[in-house]
Design a protein with these regions (language model features):
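Eukaryotic helix-linker segments that join adjacent hydrophobic helices
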Residues: 70-95
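An N-terminus-focused feature that recognizes amino-terminal "leader" regions
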Residues: 6-68, 75-78
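The conserved glycine-aromatic submotif of the RRM
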Residues: 72-77, 197-204
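Short hydrophobic/aromatic beta-strand micro-patches
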Residues: 25, 80-84, 146, 206-210
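Vicinal oxygen chelate
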Residues: 1-15, 21, 45-46, 87, ...
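Short acidic-aromatic low-complexity motifs
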Residues: 26-30, 147-152
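Conserved active-site tyrosine of GNAT-family acetyltransferases
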Residues: 32-37, 121, 155-160, 219
Length: 290
């Protein structure tokens, strides 16, 4: 605490500056467009990946990357989203429900948020904007993973010692939960469970970090780098205990430097309330706060 009463540590961010996207493969672009754009009200990126081999979906300053593959990928946990109007979201989801019949799609309003499952089984929890998400009005504030019992503490140590990102370890209903800070209004959450966890299928997330070489050196030394993508990017999959080397969890990280050419690119978000019957001139785009 400083002399003037400010706790400067509350403004620390850590080495991971932002989570940029979550990547899951999908087998059907038309279904994905119906769910992500018409249902959730998000926006297909008009500048990148506009062909049938992939689609990028914008959500504030973050994205979903959805490569077209025969086998869909399912994240082992929950993807958190913030949206400005949950009532409008509910109406959109009800509208697209008949078009998603026969898939794993479901939606349910519960305790101030909306729980949604995509056509292939990915789970989303959608919140209204609030102080727990900073000034984010539309975006991807967290991803929560279900992890084996006895791993949450070691996962936190990995992020602190290897990735240089601060974390907290708490108990929630007698379950250990690690929360890793990834930028000013985002986090990765690792919640222990006694239930069986599906085998990892290759989905990934992308982060930007400030100290790019330090984590790489540690990962390289321990033979954990899985791809040397470019001068600005590398990848790893296994999260290990930094002291024992025991594998704790698998989730591919696409690690980008703060000099990556795509950092800060303009991400367009449409206003999903616009329609032909009630069109408002000059309100096509949605102004977001990261």
């Amino acid at each position: 605490m400083s002399e003037n009463g400010f706790d400067r540590s509350t403004q620390d961010v850590g080495n991971i500056l932002a989570m940029e996207h979550v990547n899951v493969c999908i087998p059907d672009q038309q279904l994905a467009q119906t769910f992500y754009a018409a249902g959730l009200g998000l926006t297909r990126d008009p500048y990148m990946m506009v062909g049938p081999e992939n689609m990028w979906i914008n959500v504030g300053q973050q994205q979903f990357h959805l490569p077209t593959r025969e086998q869909p990928q399912v994240l082992r946990g929950t993807i958190g989203l913030v949206m400005p109007d949950l009532e409008a979201l509910k109406q959109r989801l009800m509208t697209v429900m008949p078009r998603l019949d026969g898939t794993k799609f479901s939606c349910k309003a519960d305790n101030g948020h909306v729980d949604v499952t995509c056509p292939w089984g990915n789970h989303f929890r959608i919140h209204a904007q609030g102080p727990q998400f900073g000034d984010m009005t539309l975006g991807l504030p967290y991803v929560e993973f279900l992890v084996p019992q006895g791993t949450a503490s070691g996962i936190g140590q990995f992020y602190k010692e290897v990735m240089q990102a601060p974390y907290t370890l708490t108990q929630d209903m007698n379950v250990a939960v690690t929360k890793v800070k990834v930028g000013p209004a985002q986090c990765l959450i690792f919640r222990e469970t006694s239930e069986d966890i599906p085998e990892y299928d290759g989905h990934h997330l992308a982060v930007y970090i400030a100290n790019f070489s330090g984590p790489h050196a540690w990962l390289k030394k321990h033979d954990l780098v899985t791809q040397e993508s470019s001068a600005y990017q590398y990848r790893f999959v296994d999260i290990v205990h930094p002291e024992t080397g025991r594998k704790l969890f698998a989730i591919e990280h696409e690690v980008r430097s703060f000099t990556h050419p795509m950092l800060g690119r303009e991400i367009l978000n449409r206003n999903p309330s616009q329609n032909i019957g009630g069109y408002a001139r000059g309100r096509d785009t949605f102004a977001t706060v990261a």
